Amino acid sequence: MATASAGIIVGCVSLGLGQQITSFVEILSGGNIFLLLLITALASLLLGMGLPTTANYIIMASLTAPILVQLASGIVVHGVALAVPLIAAHLYCFYFGILADDTPPVGLAAYAAAAIADTSPIATGIQGFLYDIRTAILPLMFIFNHDIILWGIDSVPEGIFLFFMTVLGCMSFASLTQGWFIAKNT
């Protein structure tokens, strides 16, 4: 069913709905990259609710990723023209689409976890989203720092160094937001 709905959305995009959505998002963002990223993230969260991973990617790749690539290419940040690689845009939209699985109110993963823990699905979804703040920040890094996705990295040692620094940064950020490092922080 979800894949069929993804096919309907892709069909609508091929009929010109994608251009209408792009112009609407362009008007809403007003050329502000942060507003553009926020609108794209919210659209990905809304469109990704209740979808399996494959259908989620099909929808994000056909609706939100082209918007991000097309509109971000004309934005200048601190005197430098922003160029968003296609892979960074796809990862950005896909991450937020997948985040919809544990974000209330739909949050299918939160409902499953709440049934196991015998708690409220909404409270479980909110707690899960707080644990996923790292996942909400990481796609922003894909857009502004292409090294994290190894875009333009020429040497293996540099790639290994970036990998370990990214893992260390994500672990540090997760321990900060969750209140744990080696022991519970009070």
Where are the regions that the model predicts?
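Alpha-helical transmembrane segments of multi-pass membrane proteins
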Residues: 33-47, 74-99, 123-134
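Core transmembrane alpha-helical segments of multi-pass membrane transporters/permeases
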Residues: 1-17, 37-50
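Membrane-interface helix termini and inter-helical loops of multi-pass transporters
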Residues: 12-28, 146-156
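Membrane-helix interface "capping/anchor" motifs
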Residues: 46-55, 179-186
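Juxtamembrane and boundary regions of transmembrane helices in multi-pass small-molecule transporters
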Residues: 95-185
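Hydrophobic transmembrane alpha-helices that form the pore/transport pathway of multi-pass ion
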Residues: 53-96, 106-123
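Alpha-helical transmembrane segments of multipass membrane proteins
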Residues: 8, 42-46, 66-67, 71, ...
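Hydrophobic alpha-helical transmembrane segments of multipass membrane transporters and ion channels
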Residues: 1-5, 30-39, 130-138, 169
